[in-house]
């Protein structure tokens, strides 16, 4: 699984870096030629795209290294650090200052048609990239690629806003460029805060989504020989899910048979969530307090 995961995530990061680099060169020319502050916003964002995607590529390769004596649970948390770094890279503050300045004192653009052409190219390329990233996220659940995808999704909205702003400026409403740049800056800042929150939650070992935990509960409680279960604990580090659970079994069940049942339950969980780290503890029903004989999500 890790080989497929690493290959897909690396390809997503390489594709994002290559596209951002190409668009950066085009946007530099377009900004120099038109003087559009909205294109300047897109240019700054492309610089952030390159830095973020390169960081993703390096961090993902590190996170896929096998566990060692100092990192016995592996290096998957590095992905959350990459997502947190992306949230730090993204900032709309400089755009606020530039857009407010242009809002107060609008500057006519030179040939908005060039800016429109460049923005259409950027929009098409970004939509293609986001579609590929969404496919990779669906296959891998990579937090780093998901953070990168959220960033490029904001780029799609940004490029759409730039198209509208350039079109309005073409017809003489020069303040539209600054207004849309201000809106872009606000949205970029919002995206940064959202990505930072998700990364911090992962670093704090947030439990798996409710739907996945419910699937684990369904697998366990429907298994023959299991009378009940409690203390389900879950988290995720990179591509690896960590699942711990206590099974309740009849007191007179031989230890060998209890181990066999627990092993079957573990294999069933692994079939549903390949590559997971599953720890199962067997408890005799008599040692479980009556109030504890129900499923508890921890």
From Swiss-Prot:
A GO term from the CC aspect: plasma membrane
Record-linked SUPFAM superfamilies: Cation efflux protein cytoplasmic domain-like, Cation efflux protein transmembrane domain-like
InterPro entries from the UniProt entry: Cation_efflux (IPR002524), Cation_efflux_CTD (IPR027470), Cation_efflux_CTD_sf (IPR036837), Cation_efflux_FieF (IPR023783), Cation_efflux_TMD_sf (IPR027469), CDF_Transporter (IPR050291)
Single GO term (MF): cadmium ion transmembrane transporter activity
Transmembrane segments: 24-44, 80-100, 112-132, 154-174, 176-196
Gene Ontology BP annotations: intracellular zinc ion homeostasis
Membrane topology: Multi-pass membrane protein
Compartments, record wording: Cell inner membrane
Keywords: Cell inner membrane, Cell membrane, Ion transport, Iron, Iron transport, Membrane, Metal-binding, Transmembrane, Transmembrane helix, Transport, Zinc, Zinc transport
Keyword hit for Cell inner membrane: yes
Role: Divalent metal cation transporter which exports Zn(2+), Cd(2+) and possibly Fe(2+). May be involved in zinc and iron detoxification by efflux.
Protein name per UniProt: Cation-efflux pump FieF
Organism this protein belongs to: Salmonella typhi
